[in-house]
From Swiss-Prot:
Family annotation (Pfam families): Capsid_N (PF16903), Capsid_NCLDV (PF04451)
Name of this chain's protein: Major capsid protein
Family stated for the protein in its record: Belongs to the NCLDV major capsid protein family.
Gene3D superfamilies given in the database record: Adenovirus Type 2 Hexon, domain 4 (2.70.9.10), Major capsid protein Vp54 (2.70.9.20)
Gene Ontology MF terms in the entry: structural molecule activity
Keywords of this entry: Capsid protein, Late protein, Virion
Biological role stated in the UniProt entry: Major capsid protein that self assembles to form an icosahedral capsid. Represents around 50% of the total virion protein mass.
Compartment(s) of residence: Virion
Chief localization: virion
Organism the protein comes from: Invertebrate iridescent virus 3
Length: 466
């Protein structure tokens, strides 16, 4: 092999009009003055700070399955950057005496998502933002990159020791429990530039409020001997769990704070500051019955500047299968679960978005909402069936305004999800393959992510535009 520095000068001698347009050239003093070089690094300086994660210790209520409880956000740190929920899921054993012997027990998918019925952040009595398990499903599906997906699944409970079914005498989880973590995707966690200036809010009692589901809504018991009917069974504590109901332990909410210099801290509360934030609005869930009404129309009543819509049809045949957005129910075989069996398809074929009797989007195929739209406007494309989005923004994950529609100025907005043939068949028990050969039931879910403005003034947080 050989190469010579001299040959590089030949490259430099090929300069022409295109190069003069693209580059600042040494003989052009005007363009050189406004041209960077890749060989002298310019550093962006910042104020002096540090960051530290701490557990939030002041809580009210019982932090357990099926309970509502709150934790107070400390103002000892200057800026709140991120928060996450850390819990220990107990080991659960299907009683050895449980009959029939073909019973199997497992935790639901996306366990940490579905443990949450709702999370809100409140400032005194003012709710600043809220999210639920459906948003957590959608947000993670469209924003979690493949390089972090495995780690995220480990955090939220998508691990074999929890989701692989066990028979009588078998146990889910480890002795002493399994530690899981849920990143809480509220507005201040999106970027340090919109972090919550807790030190500037001395007159607000800031709380994170949790509404959690009962364990009965998260554990799934099936009879694998039933292959042509509904295999889901009701869990009896005394019969199936040895009389011991599961209970969470070591429940903690952690917060990552930035601590700044005294000079910056003094300036934090000196003036009025407006922050552009993101909020989540979820419409009431609606029954979806493809066999009797394959083209239902649902009113969607949102407000503020909506940047993206997420929607899906949830398969609710098993009440505890919260994250199933396909036409079929999961199929249990031995110690494994096929969440998307061969007969499982997207329940939605096309979707129409209507503004006051005028089509905003007319019968657009689900390939657009599940593949094309996220390809251009989202960080990732979901690897699961049934996730849909429509973005008004060029990039909905970007904090800068890049497109939105003010739903507060619209009236009579509706969405029409046209059922797929697979959904029509599965709803009557005539679907193809296991998991769709008994009646499937569905509900429609739609939510919006909108922008709003919060104002920090006089030691309190408020909304100048409600």
């Amino acid at each position: 092999m050989s190469s010579s520095i001299t040959s590089g000068f030949i490259d430099l001698a090929t300069v022409d009009e295109i190069e003069k347009y693209m580059y600042g050239l040494p003989d052009d003093g005007v363009s050189m003055a406004h041209t960077l070089t890749y060989f002298v690094r310019e550093f962006k300086k910042s104020t002096w700070f540090t960051q530290v994660p701490v557990p939030l210790s002041r809580s009210t209520g019982t932090s357990d399955f099926g309970q509502n409880w709150s934790v107070s956000i400390s103002r000892a740190g200057d800026y709140l950057l991120q928060t996450w929920l850390r819990v220990t899921i107990p080991q659960v054993t299907l009683a050895a005496t449980a009959t029939p012997a073909t019973l199997s027990l497992r935790w639901t998918r996306n366990l940490m998502h579905n443990l949450i019925r709702e999370i809100t952040i409140s400032f005194n009595d003012l709710v600043g933002s809220r999210l639920d398990n459906y948003f957590l499903d959608m947000w993670s599906a469209f924003t979690t990159p493949a390089s972090k997906r495995n780690g995220y699944d480990n955090m939220i409970g998508n691990i074999s020791t929890l989701t692989d079914p066990v028979g009588p005498g078998g146990s889910l989880g480890h002795t002493g429990g399994t530690v899981l973590n849920l990143p809480i995707s509220l507005f201040f966690t999106r970027d340090t530039g919109v972090s919550l200036p807790t030190a500037a809010l001395p007159y607000n009692e800031i709380q994170l409020n949790f509404s959690m589901r009962d364990w009965k809504d998260l554990l799934i018991l099936t009879d694998t001997a039933i292959t042509t009917g509904n295999p889901y069974q009701t869990i009896d504590v005394s019969k199936h769990l040895g009389g011991v109901a599961p209970s969470l332990s070591n429940v903690q909410v952690w917060a990552n704070y930035a601590i700044v210099s005294n000079v910056e801290r003094k300036k934090m509360g000196c003036g009025v500051r407006d922050i552009l934030i993101e909020q989540v609005q979820t419409a009431p869930r609606q029954n979806y019955t493809p066999s009797t009404n394959p083209m239902p129309s649902f009113d969607i009543r949102f407000s503020h500047a909506v940047k993206v819509l997420f929607f899906a049809v949830r398969n609710k045949t098993s009440a505890a299968e919260w994250s199933n957005y396909g036409t079929s129910s999961p199929v249990v075989s031995g110690t494994s679960v096929n969440y998307e069996p061969s007969g499982s398809f997207d329940p939605i074929a096309t979707t129409t978005l209507i503004y006051e009797n005028s089509n905003r989007l007319g019968t657009m195929g689900s390939d657009y909402y599940s593949l094309v739209s996220p390809w251009y406007h989202a960080p990732t494309i979901p690897s699961f069936i049934g996730y849909h989005m429509y973005s008004y923004s060029l990039n909905f994950f970007d904090l800068d305004p890049m497109g939105s529609t003010n739903y507060g100025k619209l009236t009579n907005v509706s969405i029409v999800p046209h059922a797929s043939d697979a959904a029509v068949k599965a709803s009557t028990g005539a679907g193809d393959g296991a998991g769709a050969n008994y009646n499937q039931s569905y509900e429609f879910i739609v939510m919006a992510v909108n922008n709003n403005i919060v104002r920090i003034s006089g030691g309190c947080l408020g909304f100048p535009v409600l």
